[in-house]
């Protein structure tokens, strides 16, 4: 099967592209190579690479020619950046999804739209988000992803497009761009830099290893029912402050590095997914956080040549903009 993987040079997308290629599938990766896209993430993978924007209809048509399916990982994903400016999020996450839907509709091709638990918004204690829950996004990022999801739902109903949506919980693992909490805190700790913990640090996230996330998306690609939405949750809820303490232990650093800083505007307090629907199809997460987090810390410790060049230049300018006033 020939598959187009958009956003395939990013974090989750590159792991997925390599997974499909290793399974013997013919994989075409299309990626715009924005700040978080990195061709090095695909090193050694037998994939065809196309540098292009999913908003470019002609480029998408050329890359997708002959493909039996499209899996869309292409997205702007960082909440803090969306708060500073949302135009790129709207372009990629909303318009880009429309372009892909237009192509799959015309060509009778399957689409898997990779989305996020953040579209559900804040989840009260004692409950978990189900696939048919209302969407209540809290940030420009999650609103853009919800917009993409709604387009997919409408295209299935109106045009009969063959499409599924996955909504994943917070994902971690090797090759994650160091603006997200785990790689940010791990690399800062390894360098003896402050760990900027938002607010009281009691925000709760459901953690999922990237390989488990990719296994879920592959299962939906192969066996998911058209028009269905599948939550992909790791079932491991951890407060950010507890996650931070574990990172300190694993990096051999102490709590003097932790700096409680002004919270993010509109910061959701808790995410939690009910993934029983996908479990009914045959998926189960295979890697516990207690195993996956030490492996991830070890990867960043052993691969400074991957992340040190990233944490200079444009990244440093963003970091100063985001945290300099908060850190004082």
Question: Where in the sequence are the language-model features?
Answer:
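N-terminal Rossmann-like NAD(P)+-binding domain of SDR-like oxidoreductases, especially those catalyzing
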Residues: 1-171, 295, 303, 309-328
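Residues that form or flank phosphate/diphosphate-binding pockets in enzymes
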Residues: 12, 37, 58, 176, ...
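C-terminal substrate-binding subdomain of Rossmann-fold SDR/epimerase-dehydratase oxidoreductases
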Residues: 16, 52, 183, 189-328
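Short beta-loop-alpha junction of Rossmann-like oxidoreductase domains
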Residues: 41, 123-124, 174-176, 180, ...
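Residue-level recognition of oxygen-bearing side chains
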Residues: 59, 69, 88, 95, ...
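The catalytic Tyr-centered alpha-helix of NAD(P)H-dependent dehydrogenases
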Residues: 137-144, 174, 178-182, 206-210
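Hydrophobic alpha-helix immediately C-terminal to the catalytic Tyr-X-X-X-Lys motif of short-chain
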Residues: 147, 151, 155, 185, ...
